[in-house]
């Protein structure tokens, strides 16, 4: 689980670093693809992690008011907000085909 969380975090840090480097060098850097990769990976990995947590907790994991149940609802909405996973895949695919 920790590796999945770290993978999303590292891609997010990479996209932010590229953006900062572009500002520091005063050259516009497009980080759309990196941001899409980070968002897609982070949200999909978060969904996998929360699914594993639900599996570990069994029936108590879906009980209203528990932390796992709350996280499951939160993660599900994050996968849709700011572009669903399929939209992120289209952005990434378009960039790969253009390069």
Where in this protein do the model-derived segments appear?
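Alpha-helical interface subdomain recognition
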Residues: 1-99
